[in-house]
């Protein structure tokens, strides 16, 4: 019996689990994988804002003095490239000036200017894609007498949809906001929508000359248009204006007044009729009268007849006088004012104009009268500081 008791104690001591830190237990497995990656950032706002239309009025300027809505003085380049219509105005307002689109800045005098156009750059591009899925969690701990802890949960779910929708209509602020927040569960929230288009679209600039939107069929040297009419509906953007007119086979234009589509404030003088021709030569002298009638016939059994009558009187009267010469006139209508002008601006405007010193008799005489003062003969709409141009691009 003593032997059996000793044997049982030996077996029990052999099977006992060590309790000290220096024992031979298997270490606990490591935890699972980390969270998913961050979502991508949304795209920045798009560039491409043009403060002025292409063509004649393509120079953005900050101007101090407006002259009747058609010219400006004391102009200079904006201090930085405008990002939108409001930004252009803000840059110029900061120095006490106005945002203008001008023909050419000559010694601070912009000559021909019109108001800037509204709107902003295109909205931002699509936001970036969300981050990739988070890494898979670690495997579960191995099965043992004391199993390891469960592996970490899987990383974040799908990395998020595309950062943002399209950047919105023209104008507006920057495009979508940043694509998404931290990854974690969803890889990132959707990026913000792109900015909306700028409000208050004006098809044509305000002012005296170019405020009437028109759809025109025929362009004349880029400064005049024929066969113009109002667009069929109010344009909502520059592209919409062009589309409305293109549907009728016409072009979008900004015009002064739709008067049979004629444009351009000053044009080269065109002549009236030449002076009347000289009168015909005087009529020839009348023929001499006929000879005297014959003597009476002698007496006889058959007396002769009476002599003929005397010849006719003198010939017809002198010919009429020649007609008087004509006087020069500009064509009736839009270009009815004859002017002598000193300075031509790109063939579409004139400065320093005045009435000719006398009434010209014909186009050559008109040119001679003006040339005597070192000026050119022109037919103008109105002598208003010589500013001109009826139509320009949208």
From Swiss-Prot:
Residues 200-270 are annotated as: Hydrophobin 2. The keyword Calcium does not apply. Disulfide bonds join 52-101, 62-92, 63-75, 102-113. It comes from the Eukaryota. Its main location: secreted. Residues 1-16 form the signal peptide. One of its GO terms (cellular component) is extracellular region. Several N-termini starting at positions 17, 20, 22, 28 and 48 have been identified by direct sequencing. Contains a number of intrachain disulfide bonds. One of its GO terms (biological process) is capsule organization. It is found in: Secreted, Cell wall; Secreted. Residues 33-42, 148-157 have a biased composition (Gly residues). Residues 48-117 are annotated as: Hydrophobin 1. Keywords: Cell wall, Disulfide bond, Repeat, Secreted, Signal. Residues 326-394 are annotated as: Hydrophobin 3. CDD domains: hydrophobin_II. Residues 17-42, 135-157 are annotated as: Disordered. Aerial growth, conidiation, and dispersal of filamentous fungi in the environment rely upon a capability of their secreting small amphipathic proteins called hydrophobins (HPBs) with low sequence identity. Class I can self-assemble into an outermost layer of rodlet bundles on aerial cell surfaces, conferring cellular hydrophobicity that supports fungal growth, development and dispersal; whereas Class II form highly ordered films at water-air interfaces through intermolecular interactions but contribute nothing to the rodlet structure. Belongs to the cerato-ulmin hydrophobin family. Homotetramer. Further self-assembles to form highly ordered films at water-air interfaces through intermolecular interactions. This is Class II hydrophobin TH1. The lineage of its organism: Eukaryota, Fungi, Dikarya, Ascomycota, Pezizomycotina.
């Amino acid at each position: 019996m003593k032997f059996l008791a000793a044997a049982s104690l030996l077996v029990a001591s052999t099977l006992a689990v060590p309790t000290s830190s220096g024992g031979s237990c298997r270490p606990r497995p490591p935890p699972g994988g980390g969270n998913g990656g961050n979502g991508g950032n949304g795209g920045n706002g798009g560039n491409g804002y043009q403060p002025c239309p292409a063509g004649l009025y393509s120079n953005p300027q900050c101007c101090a003095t407006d002259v009747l809505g058609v010219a400006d003085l004391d102009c200079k380049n904006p201090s930085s490239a405008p990002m939108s219509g409001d930004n252009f105005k803000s840059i110029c307002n900061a120095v006490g000036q106005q945002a203008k689109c001008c023909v050419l800045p000559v010694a601070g005098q912009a000559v021909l200017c019109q108001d800037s156009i509204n709107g902003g750059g295109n909205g931002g591009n699509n936001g970036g894609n969300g981050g990739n899925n988070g890494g898979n969690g670690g495997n579960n701990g191995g099965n043992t007498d004391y199993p390891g802890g469960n592996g970490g949960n899987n990383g974040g779910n799908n990395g998020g949809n595309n950062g943002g929708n399209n950047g919105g209509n023209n104008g507006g602020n920057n495009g979508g906001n940043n694509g998404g927040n931290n990854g974690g569960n969803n890889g990132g929230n959707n990026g913000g929508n792109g900015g909306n288009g700028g409000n208050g679209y004006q098809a044509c600039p305000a002012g005296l000359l170019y405020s009437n939107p028109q759809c025109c069929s025929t362009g004349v040297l880029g400064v005049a248009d024929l066969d113009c009419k109002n667009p069929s509906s109010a344009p909502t953007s520059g592209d919409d204006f062009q589309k409305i007119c293109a549907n009728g086979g016409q072009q979008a234009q900004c015009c002064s007044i739709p008067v049979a589509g004629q444009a351009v404030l000053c044009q080269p003088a065109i002549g009236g009729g030449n002076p009347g021709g000289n009168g015909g030569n005087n009529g020839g002298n009348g023929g001499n009268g006929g000879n005297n009638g014959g003597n009476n016939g002698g007496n006889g059994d058959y007396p002769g007849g009476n002599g003929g009558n005397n010849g006719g009187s003198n010939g017809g009267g002198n010919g009429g006088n020649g007609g008087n010469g004509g006087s020069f006139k500009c064509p009736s209508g839009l270009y009815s004012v004859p002017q002598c002008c000193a300075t031509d601006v790109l063939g579409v405007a004139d400065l320093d104009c005045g009435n000719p010193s006398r009434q010209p008799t014909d186009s050559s005489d008109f040119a001679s009268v003006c040339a005597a003062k070192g000026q050119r003969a022109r037919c103008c709409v109105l002598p208003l500081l010589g500013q001109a141009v009826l139509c320009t691009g949208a």
